[in-house]
From Swiss-Prot:
Cell compartments where the protein resides: Cytoplasm, Cytoskeleton, Microtubule organizing center, Centrosome, Centriole; Cell projection, Dendrite
Residues that bind ATP: 88-96, 111
Name of protein: Serine/threonine-protein kinase PLK2
Species this protein is from: Homo sapiens (Human)
The EC number(s) this enzyme carries: 2.7.11.21
Example GO BP: regulation of centriole replication
Length: 685
């Protein structure tokens, strides 16, 4: 039962033991005999740093446990004293103990290796190599190396203490994990592993027992006993090392260990988390190796399609067919599913409850009503152990089909023209919405109406508003007419207009808490709140426009807002300050204010896995593409439609749509126009 419990460090108890030990004098050993230990093979992996098996070694006495290690340990080089606590795990060469620095009560996981166990040169060389590799690593998701020292009896390696032990312990208690948990842990493993590979270090022993969990439920990749430098293919070592169930075909065939071999092990880890057993586990090792060489394993029907596809890609027999770490994190398994920002410690032994808090639940309740309202849905989206209402089922369905978009941000303070803060919960549509035309343009797009002006109490109010619908339909009709009739061309037309209009230069998705914020080119800041209300702070920073519904505008001073709007004005100012301080403009278009034009405010915004779409009250339509920061803006001026394209270098070009209709454009622009139209057409599906 001890293995099933979440182990939490209790400083008071350890300190008391240390005081008792100090009372007996430094170096005093406990004479109390230990109870017999079970065979090592019967224990799950526990150590913070597994050690390769040692060659047989014989003592005159204490042949199994070795000489007793002192309770108080002194570092000869610094004079620091440490108190040795309980055993955390054991490997071939060493045992891992809880160890407390008596000067500051900091707790470490100490790997203690008797000199007698590494007496042969090649054994000592392995320990030195592990220390050399591990001590240079510094990453949030890699077990931190702190210090090492030696005395006459032992070598001591002080590592980051992970109070909640390893993923092996969690899976032993839980049997299987839910998909959201697997995404949560895998993201962190991929992050740590990507760092290792960037340092040209192969782990070579990825498995549940080598992923350690700290007090905050953060995962750390540990155990560098088998780690090695990445070598060119022709110079790779042909040795077979690692844990049998996780070995890749190329390692078994002595073709060398590369980054792809770590990816294979990651596939085994994902499979084990979801199903509770490794993919190639059989009754004997010979059969296991045969299955691995043939990449032969069963894929239960209980797994959802994205999980099956990702596992299958990582367990490709040919190393070259396996995905990169970047490919893994961009896979539909991550993009289409809910990933919690954090996990409760209760997840170590209990299935988590991912029910939403009230504010977020209300937002999803509205979205679920809009998308699923009035439909009899007999499908089950919740595991049988969860008793939920139909409302919760719909909400879960939205969450389950979630898409989170990741944007690579520049390291500087002023990162990009747009920042995406993936909310704790995001919603997306899976499936393939139909477009009412024989020649559907582009592929179906997975997305969700993330923000719409006005109340969202029903689908008709939320998605079918006649004014909003007519704005969208007009833009879609014009864009579609251009795309379907313009000729093929290899380049962008030479005509370039010099004109001014308003467009979104910066945006922030903070819908996990408040709503969606944006800044226009005239420096107006707007927020479309989660409750459907819209608020704008004008460029003078003194005047606020508030829209509860389309066309219903209230105007008041920012410093003297009506009581019911004070909190929203505070949020509006927060968005304004954040974008001013942290984001830079997304293009080179001039910033001109035309007081004759109506005030722009956001009607609707949507996000897919590739782009953000924004539709405004005057028909201005903007689509920002995440991967290269290109943008398309369509607006009308003097009864004529204009299209502006901002390229990867933030250089803008503006055309009349009639010019594109006559001359055509490059495939680079056309593809983006098609995708933008598809988003617009599917906005209500």
């Amino acid at each position: 039962m001890e293995l099933l419990r979440t182990i939490t460090y209790q400083p008071a108890a350890s300190t008391k033991m240390c005081e008792q030990a100090l009372g007996k004098g430094c170096g005093a050993d406990s004479k109390k005999k230990r109870p017999p230990q079970p065979p090592e093979e019967s224990q799950p992996p526990q150590s913070q740093a597994q050690v390769p098996p040692a060659a047989p070694h014989h003592h005159h006495h204490h042949s199994h446990s070795g000489p007793e290690i002192s309770r108080i340990i002194v570092d000869p080089t610094t004079g620091k004293r440490y108190c040795r606590g309980k055993v955390l795990g054991k490997g071939g060469f060493a045992k891992c103990y809880e160890m407390t620095d008596l000067t500051n009560n900091k707790v470490y996981a100490a790997k203690i290796i008797p000199h007698s166990r590494v007496a042969k040169p090649h054994q000592r060389e392995k320990i030195d190599k592990e220390i050399e590799l591990h001590r240079i690593l510094h990453h949030k998701h890699v077990v931190q190396f702190y210090h090492y020292f030696e005395d006459k009896e032992n070598i001591y390696i002080l590592l980051e203490y992970c109070s909640r032990r390893s993923m092996a312990h969690i899976l032993k208690a839980r049997k299987v994990l839910t998909e959201p948990e697997v995404r949560y842990y895998l993201r962190q493993i991929v992050s740590g592993l990507k760092y290792l590979h960037e340092q040209e270090i192969l782990h070579r022993d990825l498995k549940l027992g080598n992923f350690f969990i700290n007090e905050a439920m953060e995962l750390k990749v540990g155990d560098f006993g088998l780690a090695a430098r990445l070598e060119p293919l022709e110079h790779r070592r042909r040795t077979i090392c690692g844990t049998p169930n996780y070995l890749s075909p190329e390692v078994l065939n002595k073709q060398g260990h590369g980054c792809e071999s770590d990816i294979w092990a990651l596939g085994c880890v994902m499979y084990t988390m979801l199903l509770g057993r490794p993919p190639f586990e059989t009754t004997n090792l010979k059969e296991t190796y045969r299955c691995i060489r043939e990449a032969r394993y069963t894929m239960p029907s209980s797994l959802l399609a994205p999980a099956k596809h990702l596992i299958a890609s990582m367990l490709s027999k040919n190393p070259e067919d396996r995905p990169s770490l970047d490919d893994i994190i961009r896979h539909d398994f991550f993009l289409q599913g809910f990933t919690p920002d954090r996990l409760s410690s209760s997840c170590c032994h209990t299935v988590p409850d991912f029910h939403l808090s009230s504010p977020a639940k209300n937002f999803f309740k509205k979205a679920a009503a809009a998308l699923f309202g009035g439909k009899k849905d007999k499908a089950r989206y919740i595991d049988t152990h969860n008793r939920v209402s139909k409302e919760d089922e719909d909400i879960y369905k939205l969450r389950h089909d979630l898409k989170k978009t990741s944007i690579t941000q520049q390291p500087s303070k002023h990162r990009t023209d747009e920042e995406l803060q993936p909310p704790t919960t995001t919603v997306a549509r899976s499936g393939t919405p139909a477009v009412e035309n024989k020649q559907q343009i582009g592929d179906a797009i997975r997305m969700i109406v993330r923000g719409t002006l006005g109340s969202c109490s029903s689908s008709s109010e939320c998605l079918e508003d006649s004014t909003m619908g007519s704005v969208a339909d007009t833009v879609a009709r014009v864009l579609r007419g251009c795309l379907e009739n313009m000729p093929e061309a290899d380049c962008i037309p030479k005509e370039q207009l010099s004109t001014s209009f308003q467009w979104v230069t910066k945006w922030v998705d903070y819908s996990n808490k408040y709503g969606f914020g944006y800044q226009l080119s005239d420096h107006t800041v707007g927020v479309l709140f989660n409750n459907g209300a819209h608020m704008s702070l004008l460029p003078d920073k003194k005047t606020v426009h508030y829209y509860a519904e389309l066309g219903q505008c209230s105007v008041f001073p920012a410093t003297d807002a009506p009581e019911q709007f004070i909190s929203q004005v505070t949020v509006l100012k927060y968005f304004s300050h954040y974008m001013e301080e942290n984001l830079m403009d997304g293009g080179d278009l001039p910033s001109v204010t035309d007081i004759r034009r109506p005030r722009l405010y956001l009607l609707q915004w949507l996000k897919s896995d590739k782009a953000l779409m924004m539709l405004f009250n005057d028909g201005t339509f903007q689509v920002n593409f995440y991967h290269d920061h290109t943008k398309i803006i369509i607006c009308s001026q003097n009864e004529e439609y204009l299209l502006t394209y901002i390229n990867e270098d933030r250089i803008s070009t503006t055309f009349r749509l009639t010019t594109l209709l006559m001359s055509g454009c490059s495939s680079e622009l056309k593809n983006r126009m098609e995708y933008a139209l598809n988003m617009l057409l599917q906005r209500c599906n």
